[in-house]
Amino acid sequence: MAKQSMKAREVKRVALADKYFAKRAELKAIISDVNASDEDRWNAVLKLQTLPRDSSPSRQRNRCRQTGRPHGFLRKFGLSRIKVREAAMRGEIPGLKKASW
């Protein structure tokens, strides 16, 4: 199990990313616009740097919903590999069965 503080930190990052999504997209559009003046682009870079670091989606980490485990995460299920295996062995995931050949 992950520490509660780590789970809370992830929740905070998701909230910040949602809050600043439009602002970041607007600034990035100005930065990548070749028709914008150099001064406008530079000002957009400076404004982007003033936003909170945790508002960047790349700082988010996928975590298991049950345990908070950051590694071995399977997006399709939202769980870590360990919890997916346990659920599959109990027959809780429809259509998923152990491979045998």
UniProtKB/Swiss-Prot annotation:
Cross-referenced PROSITE patterns: RIBOSOMAL_S14
Any one GO biological process: ribosomal small subunit assembly
Domain of life: Bacteria
GO molecular function, one term: rRNA binding
A Pfam family matched in the record: Ribosomal_S14
Annotated signal sequence range: none
A GO CC term attached to the entry: cytoplasm
Quaternary assembly: Part of the 30S ribosomal subunit. Contacts proteins S3 and S10.
Protein name: Small ribosomal subunit protein uS14
Organism: Escherichia coli (strain K12)
Taxonomic classification: Bacteria, Pseudomonadati, Pseudomonadota, Gammaproteobacteria, Enterobacterales
